[in-house]
Curated annotation (Swiss-Prot):
Name this polypeptide is given: Urease subunit alpha 2
InterPro entries linked: Amidohydro-rel (IPR006680), Metal-dep_hydrolase_composite (IPR011059), Metal_Hydrolase (IPR032466), Urease_alpha_N_dom (IPR011612), Urease_alpha_subunit (IPR050112), Urease_AS (IPR017950), Urease_asu (IPR005848), Urease_asu_c (IPR017951)
GO cellular component: cytoplasm
Residues involved in Ni(2+) 1 binding: H133, H135, K216, D359
UniProt entry tagged with the keyword Phosphoprotein: no
Length: 566
């Protein structure tokens, strides 16, 4: 029996050779592989396959998956494939072909009476986003991020304190304990960074032992060469990451001074272009160092006609500056440069900038990491054309490069890629399901640890789930002890060994960071280009390996107003 390709796609979703448009962008992906056996596809519903004795077998709960996502189109750094995805005990158990092994061939995921089904036909499945630049200013950020498809948040803060409004720092053991206890209340994987700005090791060590998964160096606390060297030394000893916001004013040295202070040790440079902060005008040079793991924050993503004007006001508020003081205004203006922001677009497209994050409420929007990543990809395709690695008529490599920026690469950087960051067997089942027309903008379903934590949902008093008003609502994995079973709190190995979870009475699952200090840029997937960067100190023009980097600002973006009328 044969059916048309269109009929097949309508019934089971696209298969090999079919192309899917991502939202209203000009990005097209093509299915590279389909794990199904044609004619043996499983689908749930009245008169469908997953019924007793048909696609559902007689095996006990221990032998079948807890949850099955059927016929989903996976976009991940490793491929763009169609598959069934099985989840067991909160982790991804299998990616392959589901069904009843008693009567169906090639089954790699057994379905039984203990199996729940989520229909993935015609849907896109991605790993939950990993945002590694969080100012924990208000707890409401967490729900906002979750509803956008982010499932892991790393950063620092204590609430709307002036220090937190400017820096991603949870300072000292007392604040660290309070924030770890607070994190038990949220369906989100969370890790906190301590204050790295001190020139002796003791105050840093006590923060790591209290639970910090990393240390943050920020110019507002004094990012001197001595503080940098001390912080990296402690990080090397305790296997935690260091994130840095460098010295915009060049008071304690220039970009060359800071790079020398790194002494070839691994470090995550925040907003490496510089609008978010850093040596003016040439912190962007850092992305050419093999030990530097560079990221952007989302307000400069992508470069548009409004980017410059918006940034000046943002900066004055976030860094406690006074518009009546000439030096404060000069400080702000030194950070906002059209030329370096334009270059940032291109450096992302070349894979020289490896990650993208939010800078939540502190010159960044916590719910727009994913959207702005794909807006940047779309702008670059329109302005630069297909990448050399892309296949004919598709943007598969570009899609893999850009999705890696907010999933696997930040997870690798912060030592949590053994738990999250990709759709791979054994990892925590933090998964996001999207309708292609809403991809990157509004997810349909967000799973945490294999359970549904958030979803689009209609009127709770309606006779079916879909009547308006349809909006995002927390689901059962966001409540009670289910929340604790399906989300992770990340801490250092030193804190784990010291019994911090027990002493603080933490209830969520505990993840331990590891491998932070051996990561090099070459380890960041699809984003490991090491250009030789030059910045003209007068014109701010940027060159990479001798090539001028300039692109025009966008007047119109996809994934924007047409999606937010309601």
């Amino acid at each position: 029996m044969k059916i048309s390709r269109q009929a097949y796609a309508d019934m089971f979703g696209p298969t090999v050779g079919d192309k899917v448009r991502l939202a209203d962008t000009e990005l097209w992906i093509e299915v590279e592989k389909d794990f199904t056996t044609y004619g043996e596809e499983v689908k749930f519903g009245g008169g469908k396959v997953i019924r007793d004795g048909m696609g559902q077998g007689q095996l006990l709960a221990a032998e079948v998956v807890d949850t099955l996502i059927t016929n989903a189109l996976i976009i991940d750094h490793w491929g763009i494939v169609k598959a069934d995805v099985g989840i067991k005990n909160g982790r991804i158990a299998a990616i392959g072909k589901a069904g009843n092994p008693d009567i169906q061939p090639d089954v790699t995921i057994a379905v039984g009476a203990a199996t729940e089904v989520i229909a993935g036909e015609g849907m896109i499945l991605t790993a939950g986003g990993v945002d590694t630049h969080i100012h924990f200013i208000c707890p409401q950020q967490i729900e906002e991020a979750l509803m956008s498809g982010v499932t892991t948040m790393i950063g620092g803060g204590t609430g709307p304190a002036t220090g937190t409004n400017a820096t991603t720092v949870t300072p000292g053991p007392w604040h660290m304990a309070r924030m770890l206890q607070a994190s038990d209340s949220f369906p989100m994987n969370i890790g906190f960074t301590g204050k790295g700005n001190v020139s002796l090791p003791g105050p840093l060590i006590e923060q790591v032992k209290a639970g910090a998964i990393g240390l943050k160096l920020h110019e507002d606390w004094g990012t001197t060469p001595a503080a940098i060297d001390n912080c990296l030394s402690v990080a090397d000893e305790y296997d935690v990451q260091v994130a840095i916001h460098t010295d915009t004013l060049n008071e304690s040295g220039f970009v060359e001074t800071t790079l020398a202070a790194f002494k070839n040790r691994t470090i995550h440079t925040y907003h490496t272009e510089g609008a978010g902060g850093g040596h003016a005008p040439d912190i962007i040079k850092a992305c050419g160092s093999p030990n530097v793991l560079p990221s952007s924050t989302n307000p400069t993503r992508p470069f548009t006609r409004n980017t410059i004007d918006e940034h000046l006001d943002m900066l004055m508020v976030c860094h406690h500056l006074d518009p009546s003081i000439a030096e404060d205004v000069a400080f702000a203006e030194s950070r906002i440069r059209r030329e370096t922001i334009a270059a940032e677009d291109i450096l992302h497209d070349l894979g020289a900038f490896s990650m993208l994050s939010s800078d939540s409420q502190a010159m960044g929007r916590v719910g727009e990491v994913i959207m702005r990543t794909w807006q940047t990809a779309d702008k670059m395709k329109k302005q630069r054309g297909p990448l050399p690695q892309d296949g004919p008529g598709n943007d598969n490599f570009r899609a893999k490069r850009y999705i890696a920026k907010y999933t696997i690469n930040p997870a690798i950087t912060h030592g949590i890629s053994h738990e999250v960051g990709s759709i791979e067997v054994g990892k925590w089942a933090d998964l996001v399901l999207w309708r292609p027309a809403f991809f990157g903008v509004k997810p349909t379903l967000i799973l945490k640890g294999g359970a549904i934590a958030a979803s689009l949902m209609g009127d709770a008093n309606a006779s079916i789930p879909t009547p308006q008003p349809v909006h995002y609502r927390p689901m059962f994995a966001s409540f009670g002890s289910s929340l604790h079973a399906t989300s992770l709190t990340f801490i250092s190995q030193a804190a784990f060994d010291a019994g911090v979870p027990e002493s603080l009475g933490l209830k969520k699952q505990i993840g331990v960071v590891k491998g932070c200090r051996t990561v090099q840029k070459k380890d960041l997937i699809h984003n490991d280009y090491l250009p030789d960067i030059e910045v003209d100190p007068q014109t701010y023009q940027v060159k990479a390996d001798g090539v001028l980097l300039w692109c025009e600002p966008a007047d119109v973006l996809p994934m924007a107003q047409r999606y937010f009328l309601f």
